[in-house]
From Swiss-Prot:
Pfam families attached to this UniProt entry: Lyase_aromatic
PROSITE patterns assigned: PAL_HISTIDASE
Keyword Cell division: no
GO cellular component, one term: cytoplasm
This protein's name: Histidine ammonia-lyase
Amino acid sequence: MTLYLDGETLTIEDIKSFLQQQSKIEIIDDALERVKKSRAVVERIIENEETVYGITTGFGLFSDVRIDPTQYNELQVNLIRSHACGLGEPFSKEVALVMMILRLNTLLKGHSGATLELVRQLQFFINERIIPIIPQQGSLGASGDLAPLSHLALALIGEGKVLYRGEEKDSDDVLRELNRQPLNLQAKEGLALINGTQAMTAQGVISYIEAEDLGYQSEWIAALTHQSLNGIIDAYRHDVHAVRNFQEQINVAARMRDWLEGSTLTTRQSEIRVQDAYTLRCIPQIHGASFQVFNYVKQQLEFEMNAANDNPLIFEEANETFVISGGNFHGQPIAFALDHLKLGVSELANVSERRLERLVNPQLNGDLPAFLSPEPGLQSGAMIMQYAAASLVSENKTLAHPASVDSITSSANQEDHVSMGTTAARHGYQIIENARRVLAIECVIALQAAELKGVEGLSPKTRRKYDEFRSIVPSITHDRQFHKDIEAVAQYLKQSIYQTTACH
């Protein structure tokens, strides 16, 4: 598959397909023409010695300092080196790759003044899977993701560290191996690379992809639990949900009916009890609300994926060109969205933990043994799996605190409000990892509960899932190191998203 970039129409589904199919990037001709035109404006500014931020002046508080024309290119290299202050563990390979795609896409809008050489260097790195090593910490998410994107830019100019074919190497060594020259930054280009929200947005895209998938995975896991507890099917009737009008809720109810169709373990209203606890009865309402959040996040991310978020921006209108210093680099819209994503995923984990508690609690699980123990008393069974899930959901509650309500001044109070969007993105992904493990715990426990109930009573669709996951997690016949089962299921759930990724 080839992914064609035009600066205007990139979608999350495009990114997902790109990651799964080891695609290549191509650039449409119209986008290249826009790049040429915007670069011509920069060249005229240089020729006329105009005063334009970041081209002929310094940065931040130094915006009033005029730069000698012989030092314009040096200014850009100095910018990248000094701003590469990222710290901590690196972003994943997928996030770093998507970061390059998004930065390339925004340059193709033709408002940044980049050269074709810069555009082609980004394309080369993407297609050759030369992955910059980009530390996660250090961005305030307001004057762009300056630190992370500077580490990306370092790789392009042959000064950074990269992953190439599974090995960490110096970028310069990889370029030499591939007979490729490091990028020689021209006026404006350092700024064009690092003024933007691509770190938070790239992590947000990966988080959205995995969060949406978790939402779907949580439904069949919940369906296993529902059957193991002889849950009441009536609560999922279409007419119940149609009168509330939330389409996502209606959709979840329909999928739950589909997962449970043909089961002999489900019950009807008043058959053994009048109504179920909320964690079973309200799955469409709870999960549906998470999908509402995911839809909002997707919309915001796709706007930003195709946005010009550089500064300054170059425009042409009625044969007139002008350069405007604005603030499109400010990450507030994405920070808000990613804080919402944290809430949506946290609730999937919260309700999952409460469901699995019902499976192991002898006061709530009907005729199932306490903690599903094969020999209660001598063997603890699933007791501490519930502890682990409780720990993870409690950690998520702390991580879900909104990063976007925080701000701190920087650059001598010139940049006096920041979004903290990249912090929201990082915390959001940790919540996703935690939530996946909570769902893995529910899966391990629900598999055992279904076995004790009699798998012949499962619906055909959930029986297939039971058989699939029993190949990963064997029956619990005695106490064992359950952390291995949990991690194996969590990894399998994640791999189902990225069957073949472009980075491996």
